[in-house]
Amino acid sequence: VYLSGGVGYVVDETGEAVRGSGLLDFDGERYFRYRADGRIYADGALHRCGDEVIFTQADGTLLRSGAVGEYTFDADGFYSCGSETVDEEVREFIASCTSPGMTRSEKLRACYSTVRALRYLGRNAAYGAEVQTIPHDRLLEFADKIFTTGKGDCYNFTAAFCLIARQLGYRAEA
C-alpha cells in the first residue's frame, strides 16, 4: 500500500496500483477504492460506499469488527447501530422518503421533513434537563419505538434522526 496525505493506492506484487473502484479485498484486508484509478482513502474518516457507511483507517484499511465511539462496524466493514432490527428500520425509513438519484444532503433533508411530520406525543419523563446525551441502549429503544409506531416524544425524534443521519454517513450524536 502506498499512502500520502490521507489517500493512497493498493499496489500488487509488480508495484502497480490495483485499478478499479469499489471495495477491494487484498492480502486479508479490505479497502475502498473511490476512483477508477484505484485511489483509496486513508484518512480515519466516515465515507459512503453505495448505500453503506464505512470507516477508513489511517493505513487505508476499512475498520471491520470494531467501533469508533458509538459507530460500530461489522465484519464486512459496514456501519451498524448495533441492532439488526433498528438497522433495517432505518434503511426502510430512508428508502420510503428518498429516491436513488438524490444527493446525500437531499436525502437528509427529505428524512428530516418526514421525521418532523410524525406524530408528537409530548415529553418523556425518562430524563431530566441534566441529561445531555441519550445513552446508546436507550437511543436504540427510542428509535425503534418511533419507527414502529410512527409517533413519539422529543427523545424518540432525536434518536431516529441521529440514526438516520449516521446511516447517511454524517457524524451525529443524540
PLM feature segments, named:
Residues 156-174:
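Hydrophobic/aromatic-rich core segments of domains that either
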Residues 84-146:
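Secondary-structure boundary elements
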Residues 48, 104-107, 165-167:
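Extracellular/periplasmic catalytic domains that process cell-envelope and extracellular macromolecules
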Residues 146-155:
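A short, highly charged nucleic-acid-interacting micro-segment common to nuclease
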Residues 1-88:
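Extracellular adhesion/carbohydrate-binding repeat motifs centered on closely spaced tryptophans
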Residues 9, 31-32, 71, 112, ...:
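Aromatic side chains
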